[in-house]
Amino acid sequence: MGQERISLTEQELRRYKVISHWMESSITGVEAAAKLGLSYRQVLRLKKKISKEGATGVIHKNRGRKPAHALPDSLKTTIREHMTGDKYHNCNDHHLSELLAEHEKIQVSPSTIRRIRIKAALPPKKKRRPPKSHRSRKRRAQEGELVQLDGSPHHWLEDRAEPFSLLAAIDDATGKIVTAVFRPQEDTEGYFQLTEQMARSAGIPMAVYTDRHMIFRSPKDKLTIEQELAGESVPLSQYGQALKELGIEHILAFTPQAKGRVERLFQTLQDRWVIELRLMGVATLEEANKCLPKLIEKHNRMFAVAPSDKRKCIHPP
């Protein structure tokens, strides 16, 4: 009767050889533990198993067994179908994990989604790039100390409607979306609406931070030397005058890089809200505006941070 063949992995073979040297007194138990990167107690257990079972003593008893917590193949197939279907099209791994739990009652981690995607040879939504080395501006300490206003034109409803703009007010200390509105384009009326909503729902902030769009500044915002000597002040835009009357300081950004935080927020919203609006069946700008409170609440619940100073820098309208 022939001997049974034993198949060992490279790691198992190394463990068997090292423990065998120990058993032959070629090395000590401490040296065996160091060579294998194990504790002395672990190598002692291996030695006892090999003494009793021979080479099979290094084979893990779960080898070849399907883990008890492994996903059923049928569930993996369902997840792959969701990955390639229209419903969750263009969804990243983290967002898909959230949406499957919310809409399909499928609880799987983003890392599980990623493993299934890689095994199915499906590309990621975005290539992973190393983070850029840049110095982030420190957040303001108090909620309401600074609110950033900006707009983002985008195909928010994909091919179900023409592109339109999202105007949003973002608190700098917390990252909260204070309020937002969808508009056909970025315009003065839209920012008046945004500011009124902000004042009514959250109060009046100390300062707002915007880009240098003509909505926010007068085309005649540079004075001649003669005008400066005469004591004339820079004329304000219609929106700038409204901020002055509300007692809100208006800070203009000098470079697009100065608005990095709000620009990154809009990238996140474009990634997520396009899919969320699709799942809601939204087909018009008016319907999109009705869904904004729900979208804002969900975003703030997931992404807002606590301010470093709990006091609020807000006064009522």
Identify what each model region corresponds to.
Residues M1-Q3, T9, S20, G29-T84:
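Short, basic alpha-helical/linker "hinge" immediately adjacent to a nucleic-acid-recognition surface
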Residues E10-Y16:
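Short alpha-helical elements of helix-turn-helix
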Residues V18, A32, V43-L46, G54, ...:
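Mobile genetic element proteins and their domesticated derivatives, centered on retroelements
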Residues W22-E24, K87:
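Short amphipathic helical patch at the helix-1/turn junction of helix-turn-helix
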Residues G54-H155, E226-V234, C313-P317:
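Basic, flexible linker segments flanking DNA-binding modules
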Residues E102, I106-Q107, I118-I177, P184-M206, ...:
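Mobile-element integrase/transposase regions
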Residues A199-G231, F254-P256:
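Acidic/histidine-rich, metal-coordinating catalytic segments
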Residues E232, Q238-P316:
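Charged alpha-helix within mobile-element recombinases
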